[in-house]
Amino acid sequence: MWLAAAVPSLARRLLLLGPPPPPLLLLLSRSSRRRRRLHSLGLAAMPEKRPFERLPAEVSPINYSLCLKPDLLDFTFEGKLEAAAQVRQATNQIVMNCADIDIITASYAPEGDEEIHATGFNYQNEDEKVTLSFPSTLQTGTGTLKIDFVGELNDKMKGFYRSRYTTPAGEVRYAAVTQFEATDARRAFPCWDEPAIKATFDISLVVPKDRVALSNMNVIDRKPYPDDENLVEVKFARTPVMSTYLVAFVVGEYDFVETRSKDGVCVRVYTPVGKAEQGKFALEVAAKTLPFYKDYFNVPYPLPKIDLIAIADFAAGAMENWGLVTYRETALLIDPKNSCSSSRQWVALVVGHELAHQWFGNLVTMEWWTHLWLNEGFASWIEYLCVDHCFPEYDIWTQFVSADYTRAQELDALDNSHPIEVSVGHPSEVDEIFDAISYSKGASVIRMLHDYIGDKDFKKGMNMYLTKFQQKNAATEDLWESLESASGKPIAAVMNTWTKQMGFPLIYVEAEQVEDDRVLKLSQKKFCASGPYGGEDCPQWMVPITISTSEDPNQAKLKILMDKPEMSVVLKNVKPDQWVKLNLGTVGFYRTQYSSAMLESLLPGIRDLSLPPVDRLGLQNDLFSLARAGIISTVEVLKVMEAFVNEPNYTVWSDLSCNLGILSTLLSHTDFYEEIQEFVKDVFSPIGERLGWDPKPGEGHLDALLRGLVLGKLGKAGHKATLEEARRRFKEHVEGKQILSADLRSPVYLTVLKHGDGATLDIMLKLHKQADMQEEKNRIERVLGATLSPELIQKVLTFALSEEVRPQDTVSVIGGVAGGSKHGRKAAWKFIKDNWEELHNRYQGGFLISRLIKLSVEGFAVDKMAGEVKAFFESHPAPSAERTIQQCCENILLNAAWLKRDADSIHQYLLQRKTSPPSV
């Protein structure tokens, strides 16, 4: 047990933040030097935007009547499109989106007039468009556009593609499935593939009679196909007015479980054959979620059914197609015996996210991809609200701070970040903005806005917005207008500072006791990962600030809107011995830098747990980020981390673990990596001893998550007792004597692999091959990179591209190798360069290529590696990953600067701890 009186005041040893920060000129010059390095490598600015024009407005669709006939053996499909169209301006051509499709014939028949056959199809492959030319002018009015076409069921996990699966009998077969967001409906049928060009859809599928056929709407007819007795034609009801990216169809073999929500919507979860039981948890979540959203928005779900389906090969986590939501198997299926607690939580969040889109995105759709964040930021916020409603025991809002809020701040502090509202055009640019800014920063600023407005007015404003724009398109300004009308607050003025400029502020705060009151002096400056902002015109934010005190740590004593660079506020009746903290609940999207006296007063609240968990987390994370930026010393943050010895909260430990992982990766470039592992063992051993290996009576979801986290951290660091017990339990698991609980498998697998040999890896690969559940395969794939032997690392990398690993999971295997060790990082980067053509062809410019690059290179910490990465991608372009590459190179330079700045002092501190360890 650690007592406050056992050591000198921790904050006095810190010399952490003041008196005020180091001389400004020194910091500015340091920051300027970093920025000059970025410029010298050409990393300071994104490449020029590619030329792009949206579709002309002369012709637009009213209704698509679409029939598709996929061939699941030859991997082709035939299509017939009859589109009711409106000619708004006389023209002799129709421009549509079209990619990887061959048009056979096309014609246009004005209403009540003769058919006009197109005389030419001009494909603009770079722009993914086709121009249909006609011999005479199409006059204004309505008519029918007919197109016959053929395409390939590709293996790129986009458009209309094939998904490989194995039947219970062991036979390999293929399903035909879709993934259209953002710009891939054009790979399934010629269309006006922009979110604002909405229409209704009548969809028919011609499929083998023993296959399941699904689309957005319910089946209204199923009849034999006249040309082949083995086929049937399945017709679906007409959809509401909707965008092309939300259209979906699936053809394959599936079982399902079903129920009805309390408001009468038919809910089904489709699973691989024989695994219907694994769909029950998601079914339960979906059946609770639909009524929750209906009540929250006060707008009913507009379709008669909602299907959730698990797809074997799937690039994203899930996709919100209206009425037919597609998922990775690991984001939907839960095995009561073999799924871990984190998987159940993940499924609940993903289901909550995708069903929120049925209103926010599907019923009301962004006008253009600039406003993507309206879809994704909102869904990424309200998924937590939904899960908190369904599973209050998850303490999910604390987890939000670690999973989304801090992740967004990490990215948004870079020079190569982007505003939430970002101008995009070419499809490759659209793919780039599916990132932590659109999702996690979007969610974080909505959370801040919700807190600023209050739940009652927020719900009122949401109802106004959804009602006004249902079946239409909207822009960010439309949402602000509705919320402003509901709340009477200056929403647009406040939020424009958060969505139209990138970055966020660092709030510096000092306090002075004046009789019975506390006077706070606040100032804001842009927070930069490279150090204090050195530009002349520093951006400003309108910052909703909440202030709490130790008198009532869970309630705001004062709420203000900071609308200027500096201001002072007075807290009435605050005693000299009471602490004051900014950002109650870590809700405001900013970082806080306290004067040394204020920080000293807060640290006992970490030790005695009087600070709420989410505030303990936020305080630690702010300090760590200030250290990464060179504003404070990393050593002082390590000292603060030691104050968490009594910490009971899973999410606080998770954030600590993440930050120590970042530091461990940095120090893997030094010769004292083992010393930081000793520090990790010292910090995590007490909580590990308290938890033990086996659940205790009365424990719940968060205890299970914490146990797995702590044992994994100790095992990876080489904690002797943990390693021995992991090996014992692994041996019994492999021999079938005592099967590991699902919550212990990841930490045990990680531990034995990290400290194992070739035989251990062979056993793990055998377990992978035998696993019937994708969750178990993924669990193994994610830890394979922990192996340390160069020969075994190469074996894992080769395995990553084998047929044993699903295409979307190759990324996590290679990324795991890069994150596993210094040698693994070098080997993974070489492997990517050597196999670039295959990898790039596999992912075809989707967001998985960005994730692969990010996971593989951003852990480097040598300046020259930034130049090497940049040079490679200049000669091997990855258009959809340009921003990611810039960000990775920037992070490499930042890591190098951090290492040069703090490595010696960290080493000295760790050595000092060996000779005189802290009394904890």
UniProtKB/Swiss-Prot annotation:
| EC top class named in words | hydrolase
Where on this chain does substrate bind? Answer: 181, 317-321
Q: Which family does it belong to?
A: Belongs to the peptidase M1 family.
Sorted alphabetically, which keywords does the UniProt record give? Answer: Aminopeptidase, Cytoplasm, Hydrolase, Metal-binding, Metalloprotease, Nitration, Nucleus, Protease, Zinc
Regarding tissue, the record states:
Widely expressed. Highest expression in brain, particularly the striatum and hippocampus. Expressed in Sertoli cells.
The UniProt entry, under SUPFAM superfamilies, shows: Leukotriene A4 hydrolase N-terminal domain (SSF63737), Metalloproteases ('zincins'), catalytic domain (SSF55486)
Q: Would you tell me the protein name for this molecule?
A: Puromycin-sensitive aminopeptidase
**Top-rank taxon:** Eukaryota
Q: Name one GO cellular component term.
A: nucleus
Question: What is the species of this protein?
Answer: Mus musculus
Q: Which sequence positions carry the modification called 3'-nitrotyrosine?
A: 465
Look up the EC number in the record and give it: 3.4.11.14
Q: Locate the motif Nuclear localization signal.
A: 727-731
* Cofactor(s) in the UniProt record: Zn(2+)
This protein's encoding gene: Npepps
For the site Transition state stabilizer, which positions are given?
A: 439
Please spell out the taxonomic lineage of the organism that makes this protein.
Eukaryota, Metazoa, Chordata, Craniata, Vertebrata
Residues of the active site are 354 (proton acceptor)
